[in-house]
């Protein structure tokens, strides 16, 4: 029993499955709000909201677990498909406006579409290889951990490098945090009530990843507040456009 087929779950987990499904819905709501918000912010600020590599890794993960190794849970499948479809809009907006951020690097500016394609295919092959190596159930979770850490580090790095709230907002940060913390809650229930399959979630590496995620995303909120306050003190009415 690898934990991917919910029908194989023990009675203890089946009893709290509605709560687990609620966390999955919360995860979906958080990320769908985040994706829709990123599309809106991208067109409003004429830039991209998610860093390039995290975006490519994230959409590759969704493609793999929607098409190649789909979950047997209808709730998870529904959430993943909604997220994937909206994420295509995020990718389109990112490709449309990415060149505006790379005027200082002509090689990147002229080949941005190719970079997105190659990076997405690279991450997609990596997620598939991981699933074939350790099994879809474990790879599904470890791939999500990789995506989350890339998103957290990439988001903070992008904010600090731009020195501007361009492409970002409190709503994007809060919705991303909601989606990710609901994922943690969902995983926690599986660890507590389905330990036969998910006892590994109590491993040092998983706990380290959780601490890193909470620390970086918490620090992101502080940095965003500081950058936003600085923009207002300088009389900047809106996020600065890229040069």
UniProtKB/Swiss-Prot annotation:
It comes from the Eukaryota. It is found in: Membrane. Disruption phenotype: Impairs the production of paxilline. This is Terpene cyclase paxB. It is a multi-pass membrane protein. It is an enzyme of class 4 (lyase). One of its GO terms (cellular component) is membrane. Signal peptide: none annotated. Pfam families: Pyr4-TMTC. GO terms for molecular function: lyase activity. Belongs to the paxB family. GO terms for biological process: paxilline biosynthetic process. Terpene cyclase; part of the ATM2 gene cluster that mediates the biosynthesis of paxilline, a mycotoxin that acts as an inhibitor of mammalian maxi-K channels. PaxG, the geranylgeranyl diphosphate (GGPP) synthase is proposed to catalyze the first step in paxilline biosynthesis. Condensation of indole-3-glycerol phosphate with GGPP by paxC then forms 3-geranylgeranylindole (3-GGI), followed by epoxidation and cyclization of this intermediate (by paxM and paxB) to form paspaline. Pathway: Secondary metabolite biosynthesis. The chain crosses the membrane at residues 23-43, 49-69, 78-98, 112-132, 134-154, 172-194, 205-225. InterPro entries: PaxB-like. Its EC number is 4.2.3.-. Keywords: Lyase, Membrane, Transmembrane, Transmembrane helix.
């Amino acid at each position: 029993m690898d934990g991917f087929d919910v029908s194989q779950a023990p009675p203890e987990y089946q009893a709290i499955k509605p709560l687990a499904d609620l966390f999955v819905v919360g995860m979906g709501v958080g990320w769908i709000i985040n994706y829709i918000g990123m599309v809106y912010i991208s067109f409003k600020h004429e830039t991209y909201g998610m860093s390039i590599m995290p975006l490519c890794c994230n959409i590759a993960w969704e493609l793999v677990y929607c098409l190649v190794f789909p979950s047997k849970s209808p709730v998870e499948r529904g959430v993943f498909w909604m997220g994937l479809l909206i994420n295509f809009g995020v990718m389109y907006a990112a490709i449309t406006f990415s060149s505006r951020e790379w005027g200082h690097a002509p090689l990147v500016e002229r080949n941005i579409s190719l970079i997105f394609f190659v990076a997405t295919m690279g991450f997609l092959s990596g997620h598939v290889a991981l699933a074939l190596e350790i099994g879809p159930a474990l790879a599904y979770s470890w791939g999500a951990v990789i995506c989350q850490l890339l998103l957290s580090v990439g988001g903070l790095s992008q904010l600090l490098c731009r020195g501007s709230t361009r492409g970002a907002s409190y709503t994007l940060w809060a919705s991303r945090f909601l989606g990710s913390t609901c994922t943690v809650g969902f995983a926690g229930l599986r660890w507590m009530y389905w330990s036969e399959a998910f006892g590994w979630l109590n491993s040092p590496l998983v706990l380290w990843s959780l601490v890193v995620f909470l620390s970086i995303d918490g620090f992101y909120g502080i940095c965003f507040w500081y950058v936003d306050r600085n923009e207002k003190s300088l009389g900047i009415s809106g996020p600065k456009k890229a040069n």
